[in-house]
Amino acid sequence: MAVKKIVQIGHEALKKVSEPVKDVNEVKGLIQDLKDTLATVEGIGLAAPQIAVNKRVVYINFGDGENEYVLINPEVTGVSKETYEDYEGCLSYVMHEGLVERPRAVRIQALNEKGELKVYEAQDLLARCFLHEIDHLEGIMYVDRAKEMYELVEK
């Protein structure tokens, strides 16, 4: 489809709770837009609100050939009691990062591109990525959860 502009912090789409997808066929183009857009930037995840579409769709791709996920209407169904802090960044708030505490492990369920219900269990970076992107669907950015924020400088 097309590479879309990634909206930045303060944009209305990033503040809204996104609408559930009723039919996966209605978001095929959106999914391709997310894939095309993420391929052009240095990031591992992109949620539909980040391209100004308030639908509950997330695309994650670690670029390793193994960790690629399309999540439609994702729901967190379980989290570990153990948490840890790590730094997060966001394509919608470039040149910044923040220290965020998140559960070490998570279980989510979501529809895939074919409309099949899948359950995923993840730890560490993948769990953090799932939660970060699902937050976007709730109108939450990592800066809302960060204990500390830093502005990055270019070399």
Curated annotation (Swiss-Prot):
One Gene Ontology term of the biological-process aspect is:
co-translational protein modification
The EC number on file is 3.5.1.88
Question: Which keywords does the record carry?
Answer: Hydrolase, Iron, Metal-binding, Protein biosynthesis
Q: Which reaction does it catalyse?
A: N-terminal N-formyl-L-methionyl-[peptide] + H2O = N-terminal L-methionyl-[peptide] + formate
Q: Which Pfam families match?
A: Pep_deformylase
Q: Which InterPro entries match?
A: Peptide_deformylase (IPR023635), Peptide_deformylase_sf (IPR036821)
What GO molecular function annotation could you give as one example from this UniProt entry?
Answer: metal ion binding
Q: Entry cofactor note text?
A: Binds 1 Fe(2+) ion.
Could you say which residues bind Fe cation here? C90, H132, H136
Cofactors demanded by this protein: Fe(2+)
Q: Looking at the keywords, is Translocase present?
A: no
Per the Swiss-Prot or TrEMBL record, the active site comprises E133
Record-linked NCBIfam families:
pept_deformyl, PRK00150.1-3
The role this protein plays is: Removes the formyl group from the N-terminal Met of newly synthesized proteins. Requires at least a dipeptide for an efficient rate of reaction. N-terminal L-methionine is a prerequisite for activity but the enzyme has broad specificity at other positions.
Give the family, as the similarity comment puts it.
Answer: Belongs to the polypeptide deformylase family.
What PANTHER family does this protein map onto? PEPTIDE DEFORMYLASE
* Protein name listed in UniProt: Peptide deformylase 2
What species is given as this protein's source? Clostridium perfringens (strain 13 / Type A)
